[in-house]
């Protein structure tokens, strides 16, 4: 009676469970992957279960989401409020997976109302929480003093339970004169440190050596452990023990009992006494193996003292050391293979089931979900599950070791009202082990995700001048769907770059997502591309997503510096710069100006003097390019100085350019013109005739000018003498004031400004001489005849002519303002000075400026065919940007002894006589400073 009541209660419970689960219609299995670092605090976030299941957090408890697998699942839990998978306890990767490099914990997540099972795989990421350590506090090694160099001595292995890069990586030995450290690899990838003797030992000199062995891992930060090593030098022991086998191999079943002998090793030593007694010990034995095996140090017998488990450790490799009393040792390897034994029967776990089914349910209706497991491996762990063939049901394998029990045909309640289904699981061991369970079933009267990119945007970098077809970047989109719905193809949006279709620059592999360059990019053309990658799955209808990708072109040093000044002539000639012989050290001769089309460090330029005809005479500013005198010019210095200046950028590798400068050393134009013939003859013998013509022409002009001056002087003396006679004859007449203006009777012709423009081009076949052209804008103001002397007359003549003039008249008169020039006419940065400012002509710089202007003008004319200087006065034909940045230095005045007939003015440069104004006609024929016309 009691049994009937129990059966009735059981039936009612099964009926209620069938009604509760009667609405279950589908099943779907998939795997969810998460990762979490070890030693994470309890309650830490692992993954968003609700999001991955497509549920709201509040629906998890309502729909019966729970973890159903066994094992290490107590380490994780589902938070019903947040819908997250969290840690439920301390996670120690070394405890869970020990030496396994990849540590995964698998569990199953069941959605109760839909009978869906999800595989959850959590990867435990190792952190560097363990430092390498040695089991011994101190290691003592005994070495014979007659040990030959190259002898090896075993060192202890450090232990680091971490894996991967955080595990033990290397060893270091403290510096010493006798020993070195070498690592010997093992079959499992580990390395054993060995102490190698590098030199002969002498016990009488040093009986012991203290060393320090340090083990380091590869974590960040690096952890290390050290053990002191004391090397004791012993007396002679000339034989080492020898094992009978170099490798001992043995296989033992996993169910071997404790205390059973595994094998016995044997080593012999021909020495006598203590040197022939061999002691056995494990060398560099792992802590886990030391708990299972033990070695008799006297006999060499290896025994099992712990329990073997094939499922944990399948193979052991140990080194056994045989050492005699003299400290010599030898090693052998013992390989123990654990053989699996079918000692575990399969286990059947019903994760979910129904106890009632509609009779008209279509074939394939899910009745129950079950899991079968076997702790054995190999054939012993291969499990097959089956049910009796006469039942209208069948088992289908779903995921891993999970099965679902479904109907194979339509059930008829009128024929059978209930079924007792027996499930049997059998492994493939010998003998096979099996397990079974029962399911009672009563027959009652009666389905997304676009591809997702891991990042919201990407940035890729490619150096310019890349080869066509080079791989630039790779994008990957993940689709949580499966099969066709997870097949992702990639494409680019149809955009344009500078009016050119994007497809002409880059392309993408539709299957792999690899981006390729179709052209060689130029950083100077454009520096970045903005792309948008589209990922589309193969579902129906297809779903897609896109992501932005910024492609940045990196600059390379592909442009050499370009020299702007001095410009390279088209006829192969070189421009000439002027440096007066009176120039002091640091005098600015010229400036080399260069630019680089690259950017950043590739465009940083430095200047250096590569070659000079007179070493040590000139120096070049490293960062400015200014060419200055390094010392005072000497008479022995050649008139023509050749300089080779190199301009180099800071790219990798650096690129450079060179320019050759020719500097003429002279104090004045006549000196240059006098030596011009010799300069040209030295430069090129073929131009000697042309140089001769130039010298003859200049000499002729000088002679004509000298004759003209003599005539004017004679005329002036004659007029003066005539005026004295008139004064003597007309003594009773009222005196007329002396005119303060120079007459127009021929003296004005002398006051015309003559410009001798000479183009000197070194190493050229051409030279130019432009004859003087008058400038009628200059006027000299006459002074009283007794205010100053005429230096060109001898003292006696002066006394006769001047008569009773004041003896102070020999003082130097103030300069004529007509010899002043505007600031804009001075060499320097073009356009940087106010054109209205005036200043006295620099001492002894008139010839220098004229020669430089003429040199630059001729260089420009050689390049563009022009007969003018091209630039404004004082600019030397340079633009405001690239003009040489220098100021002419003052040198001793030589014009204070020059007298101009018919005028009381001298070519002196007395201070304090400036009127701050430019002469009335001083700039009549001059142009403003400006950039040279480009052709």
Swiss-Prot record:
Organism: Pan troglodytes
UniProt key word Transmembrane helix: yes
Domain Cadherin: 30-134, 135-243, 244-348, 349-453, 454-563, 571-677
Membrane topology of the entry: Single-pass type I membrane protein
Transmembrane stretches, start-end: 694-714
Basic residues compositional bias, start-end: 925-935
Segments of skewed composition (Polar residues): 807-844
GO molecular function annotations of the record: calcium ion binding
CDD domains, per the entry: Cadherin_repeat
Extent of the signal sequence: 1-29
Annotated glycosylation sites: 48, 255, 266, 420, 546
Function description: Potential calcium-dependent cell-adhesion protein. May be involved in the establishment and maintenance of specific neuronal connections in the brain.
Gene Ontology CC annotations of this record: plasma membrane
GO biological process terms on file: homophilic cell adhesion via plasma membrane adhesion molecules; nervous system development
Location of region: Disordered: 805-844, 905-935
Keywords for this protein: Calcium, Cell adhesion, Cell membrane, Glycoprotein, Membrane, Repeat, Signal, Transmembrane, Transmembrane helix
Record topology, Extracellular segments: 30-693
Pfam families, per the entry: Cadherin, Cadherin_2, Cadherin_C_2, Cadherin_tail
Keyword Transferase applies: no
Protein name (record): Protocadherin gamma-A11
Cytoplasmic side: 715-935
SMART domains: CA
InterPro entries to which the protein is assigned, alphabetical: Cadherin-like_dom, Cadherin-like_sf, Cadherin_C, Cadherin_CBD, Cadherin_CS, Cadherin_N, Protocadherin/Cadherin-CA
Subcellular localization(s) per the UniProt record: Cell membrane
